[in-house]
């Protein structure tokens, strides 16, 4: 490559690493917020530990299967759009999850009682399983983009840097959700989805 081509390649390589790091970290904002909200969901909405455990179990199983399926799909699609759309849909699933009480009222016409609670739990559980399915759109497109822009001689080093996105995302969501719960309550813990949605407009390099 000419010096100009090398310079341009390095620019897009750096941009790809940073953009995918930020994007993948934001997937934690719409996945780990549930664990932090669990005490509030139990205390404020009366959702049992058993139901919360089922939410987590189904989410984890579906997430694992989704990563496999989305790995196949991401190889056949535009990786930048695949990740951005997946993150946006995860945020929407989180947003819908936060309206569990309202949806239950619209369906049952009640503000409390077993029918209200069961409908709310069912709706929120479905939203969280859908979120688990969509979470699988995070890593596969990142892997495709990174292996495209990072040569084999640099891959281990730069992937080690990229892997800090896991810790960054997990750490920031604890701080943000902890602050939200401490100031405005459990019902706002789905608000990290707003951060995720705002990032999906970022233009990543083409495949």
Residue ranges and their predicted role:
Residues 200-206:
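Conserved small/polar residues in nucleotide/adenosyl-binding loops
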Residues 108-136:
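Hydrophobic core of transmembrane alpha-helices in multi-pass small-molecule transporters
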